Amino acid sequence: MIATISADIVRSTSLIIGDLIKLRNKLRGLFDDFEKDYPGFWARIVRGDGVECFVPDGRYALRIAILIKLLVKVQVSDMDCHDHLHRYGVRFSIGMAEENYADKAEDIINGPAIFLSGRNLDEISGRDDVYAAFEVFNATDSVNGLLESYVSLLSNMVDSFSVKQAEVVFYKLLGYREVEIGERLGIYQSSVNMRARSARWGLFNSAIKDFELIDFVEICG
């Protein structure tokens, strides 16, 4: 299954232009890393504050979307901006389908997955109580409803993280060991572990991994 992610920065107009440029550059750096880790992945920044990602192996779409959300939450922590941006970072929508057309050289993403992720992002963008959406093309309403609730719960966990918790979870999701994270953040390994436990890292990580085990082709069968 192919996935696309459509996302936008919450209340981005509250950022001064210099901070928005800084944030966009951080996102581009993360996308460069994703291109190395997930073959065929590519992403683009649209409309100034929007993001569209093409994920050839859709199982990893949730991990990628959560990492984007964590990055933005951490990066804006010392910026003067709206409280909603500090808390939520981004709202995102994931669409999945068996077929989708994407051409990085021509800057084209087309097909049912991007239609779903884009449409559902538009639907939640006007709300202050929903920050994640998920839909699989041709899946039943009950399956899509269950999976969307699952994705939303994980997104809500990120919303509840402090900045210190968010930066630790960000690096752990990228695969860094606690000693390495401590070196990056300039703190002791014991402090990294404490922040991870207070963020319920074990549960959070298990939920991400369980999502990656789902056979999306079968549930659409």
Where would I find each of the regions flagged by the language model?
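Regulatory and interdomain segments flanking nucleotide-handling catalytic cores
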Residues: 1-221
